[in-house]
Amino acid sequence: MRPSLLQYLKLLLLLALGGVTTMHVPKQDVPSSLEELTLDGHFSFHDVSAAAQDFGNLSSFPPVAVLHPGSVADIATTIRHVFLMGEHSTLTVAARGHGHSLYGQSQAAEGIIISMESLQSNTMRVNPGVSPYVDASGGELWINVLHETLKYGLAPKSWTDYLHLTVGGTLSNAGVSGQTFRHGPQISNVNELEIVTGRGDVITCSPEQNSDLFHAALGGLGQFGVITRARIPLEPAPKMVRWLRVLYLDFTSFTEDQEMLISAEKTFDYIEGFVIINRTGILNNWRSSFNPQDPVRSSQFESDGKVLFCLEMTKNFNPDEADVMEQEVNTLLSQLRYMPSSLFHTDVTYIEFLDRVHSSEMKLRAKGMWEVPHPWLNIIIPRSMIHKFAKEVFGKILKDSNNGPILLYPVNKSRWDNRTSVVIPDEEVFYLVAFLSSALGPHNIKHTLDLNYRIIEFSDKAGIGVKQYLPNYTTEQEWQSHFGARWDTFQQRKKAYDPLAILAPGQRIFQKASASLPLPS
């Protein structure tokens, strides 16, 4: 059996027996010494059920305690205390932001959860000088960062699609969206970090100071420390956004047009693609938010039974520059090979566009459709393999499926800092592909996980060279394969910054170490 498929088979077996995976481990005594720590915040020992859940809603690993830090010192004190307990203690620590992990990565079975959102305070500081930046807590939500920086007419350059995530959470992974082709992921847009390591040391780091820890933590899956503060560079924020969508029937034209746009000097400010399978009335659905360029022809378009490819783009502008924006957009559109009847557009404020997923969230919450299992699969595919992948996955594996959005868009490797811990293909252009399924009931979860299994199995056998984003592995062999030649560096950094493997146990990369280590002075 191929090791890269084990986690899916385990989940399939468990779900066939009845639903969400819950880990029950022998209950260790709550270390009474935790109650004796002097803190600005406090521990919770009883009301900890929320910390045993995440957005995936597929795993539940109850902690023994939740720390609600009142300061960075609280986090350092707690981690240092666990470190001093030594190798014989099984206690681990996980930082939990907004809990948007999928398979329990932000959980710590019978360990300590740090509620990072408790660290939100009035410490966010915007420096609007010549090289503007914002200092934000690792527990701050990106939407709050946006609101604060817009007061100065500024904003970060790189975003995620969903802004109700914490700064430390996305920087521990990568942080990608339609701006990534131009600015790189969020981890390529950081000036400085403050980190609490697995020894309990508070360290300020940057590309010039403690650079190894800086690059290790970015995309480091929480393995080397808890990000408690980040300094994010800013740029002037536009007031408005022209938001466009078009459709393609041909995958080759769809991908070639995207690749042309991300390589052009003058292009759109945001570019993402979507794959649409077995969706009826797609253009009619767009009418609630967008205006058709050709109302008559768009009303006659039939999407039933077709695989369609949607290209979504934006152009930023200020109201007094609307005419120039119109000319630039029309010039770019004239170079694309989309179906003319499918052009839809609308003008919205910058914040309305960036916070667009939250608007969808509110609608889904009202229907009870948000807090459901999300067996997502996020992968990165080399450009040279994207057509082979698409032919099998969209033409065969998923031809009868309709479980949720599928994102597919290219980015430029040159915009990613190869010193960070994130793993990407070794080609100048690669594709981010996300299968964002929602599942209701054990049967639907099992069906979706089975499709994920088939996608990964095909990719392995066909030599696609897939790398998982938000990776979900369970064995050291799988992680070694994921990191490849970078595994030795990742291990060495772990030994340097978290030698007892206290941090982020939910990633299932390292077991808590057993080593003879000098205690910190």
From Swiss-Prot:
Residues 1-22 form the signal peptide. Induction: Induced by the synthetic strigolactone analog GR24. It is found in: Secreted, Extracellular space; Cytoplasm, Cytosol; Nucleus. GO terms for molecular function: cytokinin dehydrogenase activity; FAD binding; oxidoreductase activity. GO terms for cellular component: cytosol; extracellular region; nucleus. It comes from the Eukaryota. Expressed in inflorescence meristems. Its EC number is 1.5.99.12. Its cofactor is FAD. SUPFAM superfamilies: FAD-binding/transporter-associated domain-like, FAD-linked oxidases, C-terminal domain. It is an enzyme of class 1 (oxidoreductase). InterPro entries: Cytok_DH_C_sf, Cytokinin_DH_FAD/cytokin-bd, FAD-bd_PCMH, FAD-bd_PCMH-like_sf, FAD-bd_PCMH_sub1, FAD-bd_PCMH_sub2, FAD-linked_Oxase-like_C, FAD-linked_Oxidoreductases_BP. Residues 59-237 form the FAD-binding PCMH-type domain. The modification Pros-8alpha-FAD histidine is found at residue 100. Keywords: Cytoplasm, FAD, Flavoprotein, Glycoprotein, Nucleus, Oxidoreductase, Secreted, Signal. GO terms for biological process: cytokinin metabolic process. Glycans are attached at residues 57, 278, 412, 418, 472. The keyword Secreted applies. Gene3D superfamilies: 3.30.465.10, FAD-linked oxidases, C-terminal domain (3.40.462.10), Uridine Diphospho-n-acetylenolpyruvylglucosamine Reductase, domain 2 (3.30.43.10). It catalyses: N(6)-dimethylallyladenine + A + H2O = 3-methyl-2-butenal + adenine + AH2. FAD binds at residues 95, 97, 99, 101, 105, 161, 166, 172, 176, 227, 469, 507. Plants over-expressing CKX9 form short culms, increased number of tillers, decreased number of primary and secondary branches per panicle and have a very low seed setting rate. Belongs to the oxygen-dependent FAD-linked oxidoreductase family. Catalyzes the oxidation of cytokinins, a family of N(6)-substituted adenine derivatives that are plant hormones, where the substituent is an isopentenyl group. Possesses cytokinin oxidase activity toward trans-zeatin (tZ) and N6-(2-isopentenyl)adenine (2iP) in vitro. Functions as a primary strigolactone-responsive gene to regulate rice tillering, plant height, and panicle size, likely via a secondary response gene, RR5, which encodes a cytokinin-inducible rice type-A response regulator that seems to act as negative regulator of the cytokinin signaling. This is Cytokinin dehydrogenase 9.
